[in-house]
Amino acid sequence: MRALVLRQQDGLTLADVSTIEPSQLPDGDVTVDVDWSGINYKDALAITGKGKIIRQFPMVPGIDFAGTVHHSDHPDFQAGQPVVLTGWGVGENHWGGLAEQARVRADWLVPLPQGLTPRQAMILGTAGFTAMLCVMALEEGGVTPASGEVVVSGASGGVGSTAVALLHALGYQVTAISGRADNNAYLQQLGAHQVLDRKEFATAGRPLEKQRWAGAIDTVGDQVLATLLTQMHYGATVAACGLAGGVSLPATVMPFILRNVRLQGVDSVMTPRARRQEAWRRLATLLPASFYEQVTQEITLEQAPATAAALLENRITGRTLVRVGAAD
């Protein structure tokens, strides 16, 4: 079978499509025929060697994939069953989805919900799954459509744009924050009530500003997150899942101790299985068919290295899917 294999030579990461034997696959109780995978930012860092993502070589990248069970030694899965996988260190320290087959632990897999195709699952991918977890965090924090307006930062990205669509589908009034004015019309099509320029949130202000938002999903971090915290309603919840703008948090405790604001971290990598299943079930039912018509490009395994480099150079728009095996 074919796989994109990363090897290291003289400190450089080399990526090429190789033929490997099924016996070379890592340990696991379920073998999956991979239909679709994707090129995420973390994949791009791994494939190009620009980030210290991979510490053990050789490695097959691909942090998410969707496909069909080929063989199972676990009672929860049967041959022919469609499945999806995100996270768990797959594609980082366990061979991932950029191969015609993947062998993984059964408790890492989620049965593909009815109504969702493998291709649609990978249009959503890790970003869509993370967005759903963020929405669930707001709900668990008591934020409802009646609570008031909610805001999403980094709305042009995969997590942010999906969060806008999900919140709109659930009846929330959504404001999107974006640094790309050319995406404003697209964000409004997804359901954003208004789109604000990221620059409005990039400068430090007072410890407490006028209360504007009942809830927030932040994918940016740093000053944008700090500014949002100063603008939250009393008792509001902020779900933070990203660091596109940096890892710092130049904030004060004032929003927490005077406005009872809750800052909820959201991690998608180690999310327990039951919560994963609930998130994917809701993703399959909430989003309209038009969501899956968004800008995507489909590539082959051989095109993955060049595409990874282009993604890091901001030359890629939309989601990149890798057609690995049989496609729907």
Can you describe what each PLM-predicted range is?
Residues 128-129, 154-161, 221:
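Glycine-rich NAD(P) Rossmann-fold beta1-alpha1 loop
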Residues 23-39, 50-90:
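Glycine-rich beta-strand-centered segment in the early N-terminal region that forms part
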Residues 64, 81-82, 101, 149, ...:
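Residue-level marker of beta-strand positions
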Residues 223-289, 324-328:
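Glycine-rich phosphate-binding loop and adjacent beta-alpha segment
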Residues 168-224, 281:
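Adenosine-nucleotide cofactor-binding segment
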Residues 274-328:
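C-terminal hydrophobic helical "lid"/dimerization subdomain
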Residues 98, 179-186, 247-253:
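Short, glycine/polar-rich helix-capping loops at beta-to-alpha or helix-loop-helix junctions
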Residues 86-151:
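NAD(P)H dinucleotide-binding glycine-rich loop of Rossmann-like/cofactor-binding domains
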